[in-house]
Every structure is written in C-alpha cells, then in structure tokens.
C-alpha cells in the first residue's frame, strides 16, 4: 500500500470538493459543474476514481450528467457532490451536501455530525457495527432517518468497493474489526423519508466486471477502450458520448451489461421521495486513531 499516494489523492479530493462547493450556485448547470470538477482533478495531477455524482434532493446517489443534460441548480436544492480521485489506483472518496444559495440546516448537520461521530470511534480493533451505531444515533436524534441500504465501503487499489461495508445503522452481526492499514470510505446519508433507496432509470454510470463474448463489433471496441482507460473503476456514459452514434452507444452498453461484462449503476432515489443529505471522508485505520485523507 502506498500511503503517500493515498494522502496525496485525499489532498486533491479535499481541494476539489471545496472549490466545487463555491461553484454550486443557482442557475449553474450540472453538466458544467461536472466538467469543471473532473477537469480540475486532472489539472491537479490525478484522475477521477469515478464520475462525479451530482445528486439533487430525493436522488441519493449515482446521478452524473450526460452531454445534453440541461438540469440546472435552483435555490434551496440539496446537492450532494460525491468526488473520487485516484493516483495510480490509490483512491480518495469524499462527499459534501450543499443547500444551493442557502445556509446549512438540520438535515445537513445530521449527516455531517454522523460522519464526525463515526470517525471519532474508528481505530484498529473496533467492530464496524460501532460505526453504524454512531451514525444512526446522530441522525435519529435529530428526527431524521439513516438510509439503511446505502453504506460506506472498504477501498483497495483500483477497487472502490472492496467487499466490506460500513452500514448507516447498527447491525449486531457486523463483527468485522477494523485493522491497521485498512482504507474505508465512511458516508452517512440522512433523509426526511423512510430511510431506503430504490433504483430508478436512467443508468449513467457503469463499471467493467469481466470479459464476455459479444457479437456486436461496436460493443467489442467499447469494451477494449473501457478496460484500457478505466480498468475496474466506474465510468460515465458521458465519457463515451461521441465515440459512436448515440443509438449504437446505448445498444453497445446494453449488450455489454446483459453479457455480464459491465455492471450498471442505476440512479438511486429515496423510496418516499424524501430529501437526502450525505457527507463522506476516506480514512486509513491506525492502531489508536485514523488518518482522514480527505479532511
């Protein structure tokens, strides 16, 4: 593990996150915001670890704009900005919620304080359920619900989700003990809704899973490009727009998804259309504390 690269990726992610917050003003288009954020990551010498997620209001995650997307920010919107940065596969993952044109409110504070609380109990030997407990307590005591089917995640080189989750609720069976050197993203989500997300169209983010035989020439071409450029990290539909006519691109992606070569991430919406906030940091676990790489 290259700690220096993890820390450098975290510094860049923090800088870009702070700049993104200042750009999120009424009237700004999501497409313009996404292109500025991802462009800035590259300018600073890193690469996006995944397409920037710009999820509004009841949309919790996995929305990234497409070319031609005319969505603009309105005053009072809850905008979740989720940014991934990597240097040579070493990832920093961080998120912030902005209330466009307005001050922080209780719903935002709930997710932010939940994140701080989870970080404060994290160190080697602590069971993951204790982080879930810390998150759930902070959110519920403010009268909101944690989103039960979204969670933080272990991170490995070129692997955004490395198999172990940090839930946003206390679950007695979550007995995995944090180990020195573990890298985790902790990301509480708070909502005014029921505390659950469902998948809704469209799918705007994909990830390479494995090779699979496909007959469509364009699909084979696309798969080779995806493997070469993005490896096992998620990528945006937007990043491929212009590679081929739109109809062919959609068909090629559908073909690759159906074959099992790609995994699609549909947009996630709160089941009762509740408003959603999110805050996130990446940590490296140490014996008696953690390094927060994105702080």
Swiss-Prot record:
A divalent metal cation 2 binds at residues 93, 153, 187, 280. The lineage of its organism: Archaea, Methanobacteriati, Methanobacteriota, Thermococci, Thermococcales. Keywords: Aminopeptidase, Hydrolase, Metal-binding, Protease. It catalyses: Release of N-terminal amino acids, preferentially methionine, from peptides and arylamides. It comes from Pyrococcus abyssi (strain GE5 / Orsay). HAMAP family: MetAP_2_arc (MF_01975). This is Methionine aminopeptidase. Substrate binds at residues 62, 161. The keyword Protease applies. It holds the Pfam family Peptidase_M24. Its EC number is 3.4.11.18.
């Amino acid at each position: 593990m290259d700690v220096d690269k993890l820390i450098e990726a975290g510094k860049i992610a923090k800088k870009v996150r702070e700049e993104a917050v200042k750009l999120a003003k009424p009237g700004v288009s999501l497409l313009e915001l996404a292109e500025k954020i991802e462009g800035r990551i590259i300018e600073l010498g890193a690469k996006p670890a995944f397409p920037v997620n710009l999820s509004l209001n009841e949309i919790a995650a996995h929305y990234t704009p497409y070319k031609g997307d005319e969505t603009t920010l309105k005053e009072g919107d809850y905008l979740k900005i989720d940014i991934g940065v990597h240097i040579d596969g070493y990832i920093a993952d961080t998120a912030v919620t902005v209330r466009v044109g307005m001050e922080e409110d209780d719903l935002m504070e709930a997710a932010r304080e939940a994140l701080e609380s989870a970080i404060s109990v994290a160190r080697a030997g602590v069971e993951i359920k204790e982080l879930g407990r810390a998150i759930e307590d902070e959110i519920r005591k403010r009268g909101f619900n944690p989103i039960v089917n979204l969670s933080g995640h272990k991170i490995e080189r070129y692997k955004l989700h490395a198999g172990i989750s940090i839930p946003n609720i206390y679950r007695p069976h979550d007995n995995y003990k944090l180990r020195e050197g573990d890298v985790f993203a902790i990301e509480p989500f708070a909502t005014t809704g029921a505390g659950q997300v469902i998948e809704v169209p469209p799918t705007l983010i994909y990830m390479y899973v494995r090779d699979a035989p496909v007959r469509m020439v364009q699909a084979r071409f696309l798969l080779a490009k995806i493997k070469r450029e993005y490896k096992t990290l998620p990528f945006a539909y937007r990043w491929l727009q212009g590679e081929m006519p739109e109809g062919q691109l959609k068909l090629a992606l559908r073909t690759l998804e159906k074959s099992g070569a790609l995994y699609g991430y549909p947009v996630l919406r709160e089941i009762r259309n509740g408003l959603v906030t999110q805050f996130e940091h990446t940590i490296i676990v140490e014996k008696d504390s953690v390094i927060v790489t994105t702080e």
